[in-house]
């Protein structure tokens, strides 16, 4: 059903035109190839190993937090039947997690490994500087998400987001802020990553359990990103993010 949803609008923008386009922007849009010249994008085109090598070479010598899936073959980082998390948090050096991701590419039963919202300046040397966007006077938070093939439930964020797919492929399914009542949000005090998430499996919705989600789908948009593509996700827009490739 996601393939039948309207596509997020695409715009042709030079990197230097992004800051002006973002001023006052309140609806999502995609820019193909905005970050095509990023070193990580170029490495990713050579394959997962090249992208992982670049990240490992610039990682600081410190422990990185990672989410490790508890159930083999389950790519959703979500709740289990008892409303506990279906993953555990662990700390370790980045090469350890990258090796686990590489192993997962060859083994469909390997647990999901996901590093979420890692501050590029705190955890890497030179990575943020080499992978920036021209945002004018804005002082953005620059974070990176690294993982094996994962599926992240619909959630929202307070800041505006410009998300770039640097390696692999991603599918974003977006819902406007006012659709919160039709997304069946989970408990506010018990969340996978600090923000309430939709209890609906967007890829395979159970309309008997979540009948109002049919209304949310009437307002949904979808975008599939290739390496170097970027999407603007406005403040408070709900976004469900799915990895479509191994890394």
What are these regions (language model features)?
Residues 1-230, 238-247:
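N-terminal accessory scaffold of Fe(II)-dependent oxygenases
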